Curated annotation (Swiss-Prot):
ATP binds at residues 278-280, 294, 365-368. This is Serine--tRNA ligase. It comes from Pyrobaculum calidifontis (strain DSM 21063 / JCM 11548 / VA1). GO terms for molecular function: ATP binding; serine-tRNA ligase activity. Catalyzes the attachment of serine to tRNA(Ser). Is also able to aminoacylate tRNA(Sec) with serine, to form the misacylated tRNA L-seryl-tRNA(Sec), which will be further converted into selenocysteinyl-tRNA(Sec). Pathway: Aminoacyl-tRNA biosynthesis; selenocysteinyl-tRNA(Sec) biosynthesis; L-seryl-tRNA(Sec) from L-serine and tRNA(Sec): step 1/1. Its EC number is 6.1.1.11. Keywords: Aminoacyl-tRNA synthetase, ATP-binding, Cytoplasm, Ligase, Nucleotide-binding, Protein biosynthesis. Belongs to the class-II aminoacyl-tRNA synthetase family. Type-1 seryl-tRNA synthetase subfamily.
Amino acid sequence: MSYSVLEALRKSPEEVRKVLLARRVDASLVDKFLALDAKWRQLKKEIDELRHLYNQLSREGAKAPPERRREISEKARELAAKLEKVEEEVKELERQREELLYSFPNLIHESVPVCPEGVDSVPVRHWGTVKVSNAALQSLDPGVEYVVVEKEPVGHADMAEVVLQMADTLKAGEVAGSRFYYLFDDLVWLDFALAMYAMDQLAQKGFRPVIPPYMLKFDIIRRVLDFDTFKDAIYKIEGEDLYLIATAEHGIAAYLYKRELLEEELPQLYVGWSPCFRKEAGAGNRDLKGIFRVHIFHKVEQFVFSLPEESWKWHEEITRNTEELIRGLGLPYRVVNICAHDLGAPAAKKYDIEVWYPAQAKYRELASCSNVTDWQSYRLGIRVTRKGMKKEYVHTLNCTGLATTRTITAILENFQRDDGVVEIPKALRPYLEPIKAAPKEYIYPRRIKQQPPS
């Protein structure tokens, strides 16, 4: 089976046009591709005819009398020159066609919503009881369980920097720029514990722990993401053919670059830990305070290489895995189905898992889970040999395990007390227990005496 987008363009171009319109992408790409592809097919046919004629002349020349051989040889040379010229044209057309094919987003699953302007996702399910003030009750989704709080919660930025005094974005801004931070004391241990918790829980489910390269060559990075869209969002190393990864997904996807797999080698499950480097160029002035949206953070990532027929099962599975991690922390959340226009080019379907932030009175994204089908594997040349020696592109999937700094912000807003003390989720305590200097049950503001609460 060929690449699904290429196959759809040839067999049902109108369906691809509908996908592009749903994604709010220029649908004229279809016509440009079909024109190139038609010319390519025409020239391929011409090459076959020229080769046939050339072979015919060669056979004829071998049997011809000496007086005709020179004439036949001259015709053969002319044909060979023409063949070489057409083959060069085909190579150039293939380059142009491949470049154009790279600009196509993935096809979309039938369950992906096509949404009106101003709507980016559709809620699928909710979990947990949210803390909300009377003034914010109207902002809740229908059917969400809630408890009304009298005191307005403190936002995560003020909790970290003012109440706990364990983060400093002002000094980081002075020495590094906006969206950088210093993290201190118990929040450092919390960062480590969150990563260990996610890595451990997922490894127990059969995911292989991996720390991928933190930098990738241009030829690889352009294959794992939509480079034209994200080239201004990722960091390039000056003077080097290297880019800093925005997520462990990129390095893990590249691990099987140009691999031919057997059916029994799939699925392959990985849980990666890495720092993530992002320019956040499109964020503007959003979330400038605190550590919610920053240039570098640590993240645990699930990644799956799957047989094509099993990828939708795995999409639900990895989403449930992350839900279990968030439920284990006791954070109220919802799962939303992302609208077609907001999917991003690689994903055929994407769920976001959004956690409730009491001080903001809204859900904020904590994790994304995507089925990328064969969009990455086509670019990376990762195929599986099926029975009968048929080759297909594998499917790849990715899902956030936990992004540590963002999860810290959710913990600070959801588990704060009136006296500024923050309760540590019970699921994290086993990962803090072996570390003598780490907090065990509570994080106390630096200004108060650290005595267990009554």
